[in-house]
């Protein structure tokens, strides 16, 4: 097996697939492009590729050079996984194993776990023999290597000595017991670079060591060689995003339950009217729906957008018939007949039952201004993706379909207007995105000082609702995921508008928009030109809070963080003293209805932020799945054997009588350009020496 190990390319996709073939779970490999930028998130180790120029490399022996940084203590060396490279072309496997087998919080799988247990306490040489005699490792790594070309015998002797010494070598940098070690299989001992500072991560020290090695720190003239590569072994981002999505979806359900509980306490008449609506049969809903379409289309406030109201019959229906029409639209869009005409679905009251939470708020604004119906199918397709080995796409698709028409809410301003005027046939309208911007901005301002609890007193019963959140993400393995999803995802992958388009103020062209804002907030048109970038900043700031812990709504109406996620993929991070803030929402009978509206606005803004974070993480998860598919495609192209195709093509040229002419033409072109072919270049030097000796003798 000593001559059966093929060379591996320094490609993060190749190493990621190789880790999977080894049986390791929850690990991937990424390439580092900037050594001067701080590494985000946990890193298990670095794999560094550099040009190997030592003369002793050709003898394939372990170097015996020892300096002051070498660790010669056998107890320390044998207790870590450090193996001598005894097989050529195995440095990539040695570097990868040196990172994985020195980590305690990685699921190694059966193969590597058995090797780690078997070689515990072995010397580096014995561990090197263990790697060389593991057929599972050789088979896995050779399956991702490019097939070696078949060299002609005469070409082997023509390689110069300078080219023979040019080779590349993999080493690893791993943190072990508070110190940074460089593990090189061609050196007899590991190299200890010492501990890192208290105010920095181990990756910061590793980056400095690598920069000094390649000469970037001194910017010297001899260090202009850029033929090096650095890769990081990190946790699998797919699992991290799935865990975050699980927490966010649980929190979304919790906030929805809190909103429903609030409506039951503050406005019980809406719950009673909803029950009366559900008791009516679908047959009575159809004629009532047809009667109300014409008055809505001729409403004076909605004159600027008749097309939008004409296409959205289901969402613009009267309060008494909104539920059956929503069901009918959902079944017609999905193309699947409903199994039960009256299914038992957990719904929000009419106050919150007219908004589509599965749709982007910015897309709603654009659709409303453009006159496009809200039940468009392409809007929901941005979350549907599939992968052969991943099974989470089906759940996402079902959830998007269910929430598209079932979860809607009735705007609060219309409820106030109906209560004041006593009208029985009020108008329904969707809450505009510019009002959502104001809600998020107010919530952001209220949480600037997280040490001060926020108390909002409203009318209703005596129950108390306390929202316990975190002020910053916990320094656990998902420390950087929120920044990635909120900042990068919102700019590139989020269904929200891009910052360039969001820089324009929201459109106050419709009088309906102005009327809704005045009813909700009692303010003038100045709020209509809120910059959407402020909403994006609010979402980014609230992202670490709503996605770092799993909230639970108890029976007595209190939000509390769970100690462990029940049935979830991961438990929420631990709560440290001083790192949590309580937003207490009390229901008091002495206060008026204005405080109730402010509390509902806060919960709606929080719900919007949760939805935005879910959209961001779903986009990031989809990107990681697509990246993994591209890794497999590149691997198939790399490992495919093209010899059969080439031989078939050459034989076809020979049958057509074109091969001889092409070969002769190619040889003549190379001779004119001075390019040597075959043995012609090798025979010139001996001939030149034989002719020079008699020439010198004649002159003497």
Swiss-Prot record:
Q: Where in the cell is it found?
A: Cytoplasm; Nucleus
Record GO biological process: heterochromatin formation; negative regulation of DNA-templated transcription; protein deubiquitination; protein K48-linked deubiquitination; regulation of cell cycle; regulation of cell growth; ubiquitin-dependent protein catabolic process
Q: Which Pfam families does this one have?
A: Peptidase_C12, UCH_C
Q: Where is the UCH catalytic domain?
A: 4-235
Q: Which reaction does it catalyse?
A: Thiol-dependent hydrolysis of ester, thioester, amide, peptide and isopeptide bonds formed by the C-terminal Gly of ubiquitin (a 76-residue protein attached to proteins as an intracellular targeting signal)
Which residues are annotated as site, described as Transition state stabilizer? 85
Chain location of the short sequence motif Nuclear localization signal per the record: 688-693
Predominant localisation class: cytoplasm
Q: Does the keyword Iron-sulfur apply?
A: no
Q: Which InterPro entries match?
A: Papain-like_cys_pep_sf, Peptidase_C12_UCH, Peptidase_C12_UCH_sf, UCH_C
Q: Please state every residue range assigned to the domain named ULD.
A: 641-669
**GO CC list:** cytoplasm; nucleus; PR-DUB complex
Q: Biased-composition ranges for Acidic residues?
A: 386-399
Citing just one GO molecular function, the answer is: cysteine-type deubiquitinase activity
The signal peptide stretch is none
From the UniProt entry, list the residue stretches annotated as the region Disordered. Answer: 273-346, 363-405, 469-513, 674-700
Q: Can you tell me which family this protein belongs to? A: Belongs to the peptidase C12 family. BAP1 subfamily.
Outline what the protein does.
Deubiquitinating enzyme that plays a key role in chromatin by mediating deubiquitination of histone H2A. Catalytic component of the PR-DUB complex, a complex that specifically mediates deubiquitination of histone H2A monoubiquitinated at 'Lys-119' (H2AK119ub1).
Q: What is this protein called?
A: Ubiquitin carboxyl-terminal hydrolase BAP1
User: What taxonomic lineage is listed for the species of origin?
Assistant: Eukaryota, Metazoa, Chordata, Craniata, Vertebrata
């Amino acid at each position: 097996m000593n001559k059966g190990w093929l060379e591996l390319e320094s490609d993060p996709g190749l190493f990621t697939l190789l880790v999977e073939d080894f049986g390791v779970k929850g690990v991937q490999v990424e390439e580092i492009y900037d050594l001067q930028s701080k590494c985000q998130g946990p890193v298990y180790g670095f794999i560094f590729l550099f040009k190997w120029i030592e003369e002793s490399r050709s003898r394939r022996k372990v170097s015996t050079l020892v300096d002051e940084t070498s660790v010669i203590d056998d107890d320390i060396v044998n207790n870590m996984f450090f193996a001598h490279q005894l097989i050529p072309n195995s440095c990539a496997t040695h570097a990868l194993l040196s990172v994985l087998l020195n980590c305690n919080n990685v699921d190694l799988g059966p193969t590597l776990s058995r090797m780690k247990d078997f070689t515990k306490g072995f010397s580096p040489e014995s561990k090197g023999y263990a790697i060389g005699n593991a057929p599972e490792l050789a088979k896995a790594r050779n399956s991702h290597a490019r097939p070696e070309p078949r060299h002609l015998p005469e070409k082997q002797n023509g390689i110069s000595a300078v080219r023979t010494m040019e080779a590349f070598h993999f080493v690893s940098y791993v943190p072990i017991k508070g110190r940074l070690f460089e593990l090189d299989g061609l050196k007899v001992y590991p190299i200890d670079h010492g501990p890192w500072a208290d105010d920095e991560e181990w990756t910061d020290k590793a980056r400095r060591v690598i920069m000094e090695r390649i000469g970037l720190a001194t910017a010297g003239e001899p260090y202009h060689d850029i033929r090096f590569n650095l890769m990081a072994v990190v946790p699998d981002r797919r699992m991290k995003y799935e865990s975050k999505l699980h927490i966010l979806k649980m929190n979304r359900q919790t906030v929805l339950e809190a909103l429903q509980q609030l409506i039951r306490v503050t406005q019980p008449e809406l719950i009673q009217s909803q029950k009366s609506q559900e008791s009516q049969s679908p047959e009575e809903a159809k004629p009532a729906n047809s009667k109300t379409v014409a008055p809505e289309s001729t409403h004076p406030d909605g004159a600027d957008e008749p097309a939008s109201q004409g296409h959205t019959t289901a969402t613009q229906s009267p309060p008494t018939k909104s539920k059956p029409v929503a069901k009918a639209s959902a079944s017609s869009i999905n193309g699947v007949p409903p199994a039960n005409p009256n299914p038992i679905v957990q719904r929000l009251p009419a106050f919150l039952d007219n908004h589509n939470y599965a749709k982007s708020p910015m897309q709603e604004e654009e659709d409303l201004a453009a006159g496009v119906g809200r039940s468009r199918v392409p809007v929901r397709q941005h979350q549907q993706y599939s992968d052969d080995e991943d099974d989470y796409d089906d759940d996402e698709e079902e959830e998007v379909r269910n929430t598209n028409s079932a979860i809607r809410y009735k705007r609060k301003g219309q409820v106030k207007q109906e209560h004041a005027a006593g009208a029985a046939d009020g108008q329904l309208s969707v809450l505009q995105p510019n009002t959502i911007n104001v809600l998020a901005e107010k919530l952001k301002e209220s949480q600037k000082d997280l040490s001060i609890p926020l108390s909002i007193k409203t009318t209703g019963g005596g129950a108390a609702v306390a929202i316990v959140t975190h002020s910053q993400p916990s320094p656990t393995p998902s420390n950087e995921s929120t920044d990635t999803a909120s900042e990068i995802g919102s700019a590139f992958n989020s269904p929200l508008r891009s910052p360039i388009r969001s820089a324009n103020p929201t459109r106050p062209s419709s009088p309906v928009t102005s009327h809704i804002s005045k009813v909700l907030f009692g303010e003038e048109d100045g709020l209509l030109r809120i910059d959407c970038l402020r909403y994006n900043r609010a979402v980014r700031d609230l992202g670490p809070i709503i996605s770092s812990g799993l909230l639970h709504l108890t029976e007595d109406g209190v939000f509390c963080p769970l100690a462990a996620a029940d049935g979830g993929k991961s438990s929420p991070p631990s709560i440290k003293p001083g790192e949590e803030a309580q937003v207490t929402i009390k229901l008091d009978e002495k206060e008026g209805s204005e405080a109730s509206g402010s509390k509902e606005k806060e919960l709606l803004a929080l719900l919007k932020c949760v939805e935005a974070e879910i959209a961001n993480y779903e986009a990031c998860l989809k990107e990681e799945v697509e990246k993994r598919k591209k890794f497999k495609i590149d691997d198939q192209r790399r490992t495919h054997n093209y010899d059969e195709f080439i031989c078939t093509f050459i034989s076809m040229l020979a049958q057509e009588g074109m091969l001889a002419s092409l070969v002769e033409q190619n040889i003549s072109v190379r001779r004119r350009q001075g390019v040597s072919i075959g043995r012609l270049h090798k025979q010139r030097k001996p001939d030149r020496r034989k002719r020079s000796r008699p020439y010198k003798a004649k002159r003497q």
